[in-house]
């Protein structure tokens, strides 16, 4: 079977069936989904009834079972990102979720409400920016992985050969994946970030591409998904590949990021920065070893760059990480701790060169992947930098962009684009493209995990820290605080539902969505607001004497402050927590 999926499709809808027609040249296949039995079969175009309602679609994302029954999810709009070795790369920009059922009369009021909530969750994930696909190219693998494949691999369908870590609709495609004959309708979709640019240096034109692939294992939002799970999957794991294509030669440099691979948590509790807690009873070495065993198999040597603070609440995590690496004693793993905030305080971001100089020799050893126009591999990447901070976002983004630039400098010199002694930083036009692309990558990764754009992107875009950048960081930090405390439970539930970590069972006697709230959840905020309002009123409407006014103000002021601290003490009861999957049971 050729490793392609159908590019042009039409969806024909009748009350009994969905017909997905392949419209590529010479294609006669029609995928038929029975809306009653949910059976999936392959047929031909003559079986499409003329009475069907028809519209174009650009791919099948998959199917999901909710309270009302099954739903078909299709891509209705797409945007061309660019061409990748003559393969077109698309971004899915709009979707439609179609019910198999014609009516909802079989549902109770509670079931209707639950189904509406589950639909809202699905639509929330679909509204997240960053879903990419190609009908002819496997986006889930790096150039180096694709260069080292068998003829049998080349004949597999895109779905079969895809790296399952990065297929975000893998759960949605489970019914189609069970039937190889319909795999040309099964479109693997990547979540992350892709940008492509045609660039010129010294009159030599080359394509520069940046791809970030988010893992769907242990996926979620900032404070609810930290550390690793029992399989060794790290939270917020992202593989970032930088690619150069010049005169038929291809080069790539791969980096990874992922949460500190221990069992730890940092649950939101209304405090600006919740205290990270390391699990005291878990077998950390088991999960830690699983994580790095798989990383070494996939990528080779591991150079860990740990950017967390080496004092305060982050210090125990840094010490535990260093201890685990030392205890494991694996020669394939190197550990470097760099206190980013301490080294770069007072906007001394030039001090990042200390870290770059420290790892320069290691980076030369790891090398990069390079293949000539004839397909001969001239160089392979022997390992990766695995960078992390607490969120694996802001500090990590800055370091990754600097390491990638150093690799790109070496690649472009070897390819003959840069002259000997020429610096990439001196190429103003390309530098602007490079910095903006890495800042856009940072924003995409941050929005997907933390809910806002990245911090510190003014440095990534301009090469220096600015006062405006600090103000924007403050604004984004406030938005993060609100989302992390008051909307991330819903976001986490949405991701768990989409990825199949939770399966809807309409026969469940108790809906996980209906969580009774304690009386204090309503009473305490009302008391605090009333007390604060009375305090203001007493200030504005003075009593007969200043002592009387002071007494009233003190009484209501103490009442409002006291209530505030009671709410803060019980912070975990007031945040928006996930309801579908209780992750603390496996943390």
From Swiss-Prot:
E.C. number(s) listed in UniProt: 3.1.3.64
Biological process terms in GO annotation: exocytic insertion of neurotransmitter receptor to postsynaptic membrane; phosphatidylinositol dephosphorylation; vesicle-mediated transport in synapse
PROSITE patterns: SAC
EC supergroup of this enzyme: hydrolase
UniProt main location, coarse: endoplasmic reticulum
Record's keyword terms, sorted: Acetylation, Endoplasmic reticulum, Golgi apparatus, Hydrolase, Lipid metabolism, Membrane, Transmembrane, Transmembrane helix
Gene Ontology terms: cellular component: AMPA glutamate receptor complex; endoplasmic reticulum; endoplasmic reticulum membrane; endoplasmic reticulum-plasma membrane contact site; glutamatergic synapse; Golgi apparatus; Golgi membrane
Protein name as annotated: Phosphatidylinositol-3-phosphatase SAC1
